[in-house]
Structure formats: structure tokens, C-alpha cells
Amino acid sequence: ALAAAVAVARDARATGRVLDPDAVRSALRAALAADGLEVVYAEVADPTTVVPLDGPVPPDAEVLAAVAVTVPGRELRVRLIDNVLLGDVADEERLLAAVAE
């Protein structure tokens, strides 16, 4: 799911458009739902304050995309959390490499 957020951010940077936090949230939620996961949260926030972002963000700005999900159908409740710093190309590449494995 975080790969979907990376894709939205990279597209905004490549075209010079502002990054829409709601578009990133939607991409995260759609990817998580497609994987059959129950979303606890899918958020886009300022990486320093961790305050959720509401308005457009310059395409070259760094923003934090964070998710938490539960895995349904398990005897024990499993909760997974992850995040990626959008705009930090090294962090984006790390995430994409991990997903490709």
C-alpha cells in the first residue's frame, strides 16, 4: 500500500503538480482494501510534527505517509504498521525494493 503512496508522490513530482494529501490517503486505503486488510489508519502528515496535512503540498516537499492495519481471519489479532517519507528518494527506493522481493 505504501508503494501506492510513493507512486502518487512521484507522479506529482514528475509533472510539477502539488501533492494532494487526500489523493495519497485514497491510494493508501484502496491498496490496503484490495489486499483484504482492515485499515486502522492511513495518514499523510508533516514529518516533523506528525500533524495530518489537509491542503496541497509542493511536489518536492517531504511528507510522511503512515499506515496501520489489522489482518483479518487470524486467531490472534495481528496489527501491522509502516511508514515512508515521501520526497526522500532513498526511503522511497528502500520501500519499493522491499515490495519487489
PLM features: what roles do these ranges have?
Residues A1-V40, A45:
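Glycine-rich, Lys/Arg-enriched anion-binding loops that position phosphate/diphosphate groups
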